[in-house]
A protein has these predicted regions:
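Vicinal oxygen chelate
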Residues: 2-4, 18-26, 29-39, 59, 69-72, 86-110, 128-133, ...
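Bacterial N-terminal signal peptides
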Residues: 3-15
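Core segments of cupin and vicinal oxygen chelate
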Residues: 25-28, 34-78, 134
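Short amphipathic alpha-helices in soluble, non-transmembrane regions
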Residues: 48-50, 108-112
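Short loop/beta submotifs within extracellular cysteine-rich repeat domains
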Residues: 77-79, 88-89, 150-151
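Conserved beta-strand in the GNAT
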Residues: 80-82, 141
Length: 160
């Protein structure tokens, strides 16, 4: 009976170890959803005044017009808002996933046939980012937040 118990325990431990190896945990969470809007000021006011999401950080064009703003939904979740352009109609633009090891995620996704651009550091947010596209055409940003990134600062400064 004892041997049977040890056998069952060993099988369970082995199965758990296999599951952990098969399901990488380096994709941490959904970090943001990016939306384009024809009326940036109205949309920004909606996210702050109606939804109650504080603006975490923002960037402007040289002429002073908005480039993009991040509104913080929770400690780790944001809405990225940007104006429409000829290349970017109103609506959903992309979503961003926080990862702990960007290089490993990029390598794994490429090995599985996904087209992923080489990682780079965003000059604005200071986050490492790689952009991918799903087979359905959805743009996905894979983001790794170092201590100097604006995302990391906003997440660290969040008050519950």
């Amino acid at each position: 009976m004892r041997q049977l118990l040890y056998l069952a325990a060993g099988m369970l431990i082995g199965a758990a170890a296999h599951a952990a190896a098969v399901q990488p945990r380096d994709i941490v969470s959904l970090n943001h959803v990016a939306l384009a809007t024809a009326n940036f000021d109205e949309a920004a006011k909606f996210y702050t005044d109606v939804m109650g999401f504080p603006q975490a950080f923002a960037f402007r064009e040289p002429d002073g017009s908005p480039r993009l703003s991040y509104f913080q939904v929770s400690r780790n979740t944001f809405v990225e808002l940007m104006p429409v352009s000829q290349e970017r109609p109103a609506g959903f633009v992309h979503f961003g996933l926080e990862v702990t090891n960007l290089d490993a995620v990029v390598q794994r996704l490429r090995a599985r046939g996904m087209d992923v651009k080489d990682p780079s550091v965003s000059p604005r947010t200071k986050s490492r980012v790689a952009v991918a596209r799903t087979p359905q055409g959805v743009v996905v940003e894979l983001l790794e937040f170092g201590p100097g990134s604006l995302h990391r600062k906003a997440m660290t400064d969040w008050k519950d």
